[in-house]
């Protein structure tokens, strides 16, 4: 991931529109969507993350880290067992995970968990070697004396830095003390030291304060906007915009339905509480275009996946907020797969939310008898060939990465055999990763997934 400006993490000029979330009503999925159980038998999967090589990693609260080698692989492979502190009466355990954005060239996986001995919450970097974990390095360690409010979500930001949440450990005052570690989101360099430019000095790892227990942390891959969910006490669960140097108000003087002076209001608050968990900002192209830029977040109390739509060109102003789907188990995390679909973790299963309509198919081998698209070889270490049928004079073929960047395009009439050398229109080499190859013609649209391993 190339660093991007922090323009949406800057507090200056921020104009947040806050809403009190309405009482949500569950109902059927929007037309064309379907929820499919992809994997059963998982044990409290706190985090789902896809690696650029196509593996689906997940963490379990009790310490197991595992992955599915591909989207369709039936059983998981254990990557490691982490010696976590776990007590079912509290919130200790394994909480978060991030895969290095340059994986597998930088073969690192970052885990956040409550360490058993000595007792602490840790951010640890592991190396993936031949499909198993090795060479652990502790990047940061913070107190974990309380069984509650650990947070522990970890994500890479648009600037390439590591963002890690830590709850207040039931010490409300720590959330309002910039020098204390409780109730913060940290911004760290890849070696674990405080990142340059943090708001409270070069030795302070925190980027925001005044939080209670963050279980969701995500970034818009297109423009870098950050969002997080926070769990209130008996009131005021929140969805927040991540703003550099902001104080979100939680502390001894933060009453229910209050807003202490000098603090940043939430984008949305929930009363009664819903216990929000993981979040994801959708930029895929397997769903209708109206879902582009939609924030999805999961909840524990009501077992739902919510969606937030923002006003045009205003990622700090909520347009609509509603329930997308209600599951039959508590929901822990949501992420986007290389197929462009949302993948959701509940307490015992992993789900895939697919979408189909008469003119769009993703990895459908026979979307139309007159229209076809083949990608060979796939995965690829170098050049690939796109074999097309049914392309008319107005046809278009595109290669797009998962952040929405168009790397190469051809407009037609198209040849039935098109070679791609792995470079952009300007000659820039495309990095290792997952790409979508899309053929659009008057007969319809086909999208294929391409895994690029080198070249």
Regions found by a protein language model. Give the residues of each.
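Residue-level detector of functionally pivotal "anchor" positions at catalytic/ligand-binding pockets or at interdomain
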Residues: 356-376, 390, 406-407, 453-455
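C-terminal tail/sorting-segment detector
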Residues: 382-384, 411, 428-455
